[in-house]
C-alpha cells in the first residue's frame, strides 16, 4: 500500500502522453522549466511563445479559441536534438474534453494498479 497519504491528491489526473489536451475557450497557465539549456515553447497559431530557462520556472496564460490539433515547436536552437523537440496540443470542445478527461487515470487508480510494486513485492521482478 502507498505509504504517503495525501487525501487531496488522490483524484489528481495522471497524464502520460506527449500531447497536451485542452478545453476550448478556457484559460490555461503553462509552466515551463529546463534542466539543461535554453528552450522555447512555441505554438504559432496561439501566438504563444515562452522561453524555458535552466533553473527558472517561467509561465504565461493563454486561452485557446479554436478546436483542432496544433504543433508545439522548440523555437530556440538548443543542440543536436533540437529538430526532434516537437509535441502537439489538441484543443477540444467542452463535451469531448470532459469525455477524454473521464477516461484518464487518477493517482488512486495508478497506485492501485501498482500496489505490489509500491510495497516492494518481488513477484513483479520474477516476471
Locate the predicted segments by residue.
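Non-transmembrane, membrane-proximal soluble domains of secreted or membrane proteins
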Residues: 3-127
